């Protein structure tokens, strides 16, 4: 019986077979252990003879040498006590070898599939900043040292084979237990006692599950650690175990030190097989899928990609479409990305459109930051006139000029699709939604255009001076004029629905959210209107000079003035909440999103504010700041884009305020070249450039930062 066990054990060693299936990568083979722990020559010869005999299909130990008979019997008991295999005495060695060959063939196929999957994951991981990898490795090393669970196999191969290491291995440092004998903390669980009375080959531990493997078994996801019970336990084992349990913690450690010193390599290997899985607990696999996904949702996307390379089950979780939809929602990504795959996806690994959308957006952001600046598309038009207004929606660009025309351009091809002719004065304001374009002119009219055909649908009469500003909301547009009035129009019928009168000077800026109208004028006033009743709800007084810019989010009104200040108002009460100071000149442009305000000033600086607290978060300045007045700006959750009279367009980091790089630098910058307007989408930047002295040709520049997802 013992001889058959040893024969099967030798075959298991030779093929690497184990019923545990997924063995820890830190387990070592017996060849490595033989190099690490020195053995006497007789013992080495005996192991070599056993392996040679096993290869020829003979029973090991049938004819032991007389001098080694006792050692052989003792080795048989140890071999059986240190194996995780269950022996069926009726099965033959050839049958087991055939089964294991099939098992290894299947494992080889799985490894090939995993290599292909890992290549794809590596490509995705490359898209993210790897700067945190070193810190994660340091953390892993630190944790390994704290738990004392590292093994010999974790060492590099050259270190294992080093003569110095081999000679010094057996001089293992013992635990310094000290003079005091103190027990472990109450949280330490006692060792489990095996049930040796069972007649079966292997039985599960009868104690309450306390390890990861036990928990898996309790949940029906795996088997508990099985113990070898096919051999009668040695006399006095139970008494020794009871005595061991009665010792204090340090005394147990001392006993374990001595026990390890007396073990052979195969016994040390067995201990590692038992101990190491306890420090590699995959708690994610224990949880229901919903809870596992909830836990993974707290990871950063780059960490999710790393987690996906842990194992197949983790990759299935990390590819979950709903998980990536939440990540996209956090980044403001509204649509999933459906791409054609070049290869067939293996069963069980479903492509995530939301994950693809997230990775695409990350690549686009990287292009904005440090991608190669390719030559922009140049859209020439309007001769040498000034481009006074600029709109960009989808793949369509609309530019208005003081040459009395508007032009519609393709952002993809750069071609002028049509020229909108009809105004008899310069165009100074415009709005666009879908296929509708609305323009305001010095000829005192507004016109509604069909962007597809270039047809003028309506001409809106009523103002008695230049239409200087407008704001479109759904089917209505509100216009402000130098005649000091505001008018509300229905763009479908062309009718003037309401006239708002109250300002005593030209209206310079207007905002409309569909319920209330907010206007700023040269009379230093900001007014809040109910357009349906044509009544002024609040007159916001405080500025000491002309109001040039406005922002309105439905709760707060933000006004910028020539008096250098910016004021934040409560739209319901009309009270001034904050006065933002710091700029030195006219605030010519502002943008407000989610309580974050970015303001551009004629003093060449840009500031980022929190309107809830009134605090200035960042001032975009320094050696790379603009050298002249800021003409236009736009921002998203990552970047701020600014243009200036100095002929440059600059990119800044919204959170840190750091300068990233110049996106546009005109050769005539500083000598007359000006960037008048900018408009940006997620992937494109449109700049209206020219000059006031003829040094720069009037044109549009289109820069593309999109990526190709194959």
UniProtKB/Swiss-Prot annotation:
The modification Phosphoserine is found at residues 26, 230. Residues 69-84, 143-158 have a biased composition (Polar residues). It comes from the Eukaryota. Phosphorylation at Thr-208 promotes interaction with PIN1, leading to disrupt FBXW7 dimerization and promoting FBXW7 autoubiquitination and degradation. Phosphorylated by ATM at Ser-26 in response to DNA damage, promoting recruitment to DNA damage sites and 'Lys-63'-linked ubiquitination of phosphorylated XRCC4. GO terms for cellular component: chromosome; cytoplasm; endoplasmic reticulum; Golgi apparatus; membrane; mitochondrion; nucleolus; nucleus. It is found in: Nucleus, Nucleoplasm; Chromosome. Residues 46-55, 133-142 have a biased composition (Basic and acidic residues). Coiled coil: none annotated. Residues 281-327 form the F-box domain. Keywords: Biological rhythms, Chromosome, DNA damage, DNA repair, Nucleus, Phosphoprotein, Repeat, Ubl conjugation, Ubl conjugation pathway, WD repeat. One of its GO terms (molecular function) is protein-macromolecule adaptor activity. It holds the Pfam family F-box-like. Residues 87-132 have a biased composition (Acidic residues). Residues 1-158 are annotated as: Disordered. WD repeats lie at residues 381-421, 423-459, 462-501, 503-539, 542-581, 583-621, 625-662. Disulfide bonds: none annotated. The WD repeats mediate interaction with substrates of the SCF (SKP1-CUL1-F-box protein) E3 ubiquitin-protein ligase complex. The F-box domain mediates interaction with SKP1. Homodimer; homodimerization plays a role in substrate binding and/or ubiquitination and degradation. Component of the SCF(FBXW7) complex consisting of CUL1, RBX1, SKP1 and FBXW7. Interacts (via F-box domain) with SKP1. Interacts (via F-box domain) with pseudophosphatase STYX; the interaction is direct and prevents FBXW7 interaction with SKP1. Interacts with cyclin-E (CCNE1 or CCNE2). Interacts with PSEN1. Forms a trimeric complex with NOTCH1 and SGK1. Interacts with NOTCH1 intracellular domain/NICD and NOTCH4 intracellular domain/NICD. Interacts with NOTCH2 intracellular domain (N2ICD). This is F-box/WD repeat-containing protein 7.
